[in-house]
Amino acid sequence: MKLFTQNDRYFGLLDSCTHIFCITCINIWHKTRRETGASDNCPICRTRFRNITMSKFYKLVN
């Protein structure tokens, strides 16, 4: 398994799918969704998630 990183950037990894987001962007998006009462779904595939994990590394999945 090969892990990737980009300088001092942190990523948001969802527990339900393999999509990778900028941690700041996904946290803002998630906060806005929660304030409007929307469910916690991935913005790309709409799979429901429970946790966003902050990570300096990510792996590519084929």
Swiss-Prot record:
Matching InterPro entries, A to Z?
A: Znf_RING, Znf_RING/FYVE/PHD, Znf_RING_CS
The segments annotated as RING-type zinc fingers are 1-46
Q: Which SUPFAM superfamilies match?
A: RING/U-box
Any Pfam family: zf-RING_2
Q: Which GO terms describe its molecular function?
A: ligase activity; zinc ion binding
Keyword Zinc set for record: yes
Sorted alphabetically, the keyword list is: Ligase, Metal-binding, Ubl conjugation pathway, Zinc, Zinc-finger
Miscellaneous section: Encodes the C-terminal region of the E3 ubiquitin ligase p28 protein present in variola virus.
What the record says about its domains? The RING-CH-type zinc finger domain is required for E3 ligase activity.
This chain's protein is named: Zinc finger-containing protein P28b
